[in-house]
Amino acid sequence: MVKLYAILRIRGQSDTPPDVEYTLKLLRLHKKYHLVIYPAEQPGLEGMLEKVKDWVTWGEINKPTLVKLFKARGRASGGIRITDEYIAKVFAEQGIKDIEGFAEALLEGKLVLHKLENIVKPVFRLHPPRGGFDGSSKKPFNMKGELGYRGEKINELIERML
């Protein structure tokens, strides 16, 4: 199993230094509440996360949350919703028949989401969390805030934002 990081931009563009904004652009996090998924061992990812740690939160996403994310917010090129039929048609030669199989292939490392951008959009546009954030959006997660690394607790936040 490959560890997948779900990276979520929490803070907006105002007063963001140019180097941080450039790194967020490289991560495809152009706007607030956008989420991307990358393999944890992606070269250079740790350094990029260290640079933008005061604007994003990230952690390991699990399979049930990944499936819910694709069903609720997954889009294909042209803004088409991702359905089991669409996945079965596009990934027929890989033997993937539904969204659960697609999520499993991502978690096993057979497919890499950011390299499938002509088939599946790599950015998920989420709502603000229902019930609001638990802490300050300007403090690190370990100091009762929302920013930085949060491990498995990213799944709870994503489910509140679907």
Swiss-Prot record:
The keyword Ribosomal protein applies. Gene3D superfamilies: 1.10.15.30, Ribosomal protein L30, ferredoxin-like fold domain. Keywords: Ribonucleoprotein, Ribosomal protein. GO terms for biological process: maturation of LSU-rRNA from tricistronic rRNA transcript (SSU-rRNA, 5.8S rRNA, LSU-rRNA); translation. Pfam families: Ribosomal_L30. The keyword Ribosomal protein applies. One of its GO terms (cellular component) is cytosolic large ribosomal subunit. SUPFAM superfamilies: Ribosomal protein L30p/L7e. InterPro entries: Ribo_uL30_ferredoxin-like_sf, Ribosomal_uL30, Ribosomal_uL30_arc, Ribosomal_uL30_euk_arc, Ribosomal_uL30_ferredoxin-like. GO terms for molecular function: RNA binding; structural constituent of ribosome. Part of the 50S ribosomal subunit. Belongs to the universal ribosomal protein uL30 family. This is Large ribosomal subunit protein uL30. It comes from Desulfurococcus amylolyticus (strain DSM 18924 / JCM 16383 / VKM B-2413 / 1221n) (Desulfurococcus kamchatkensis).
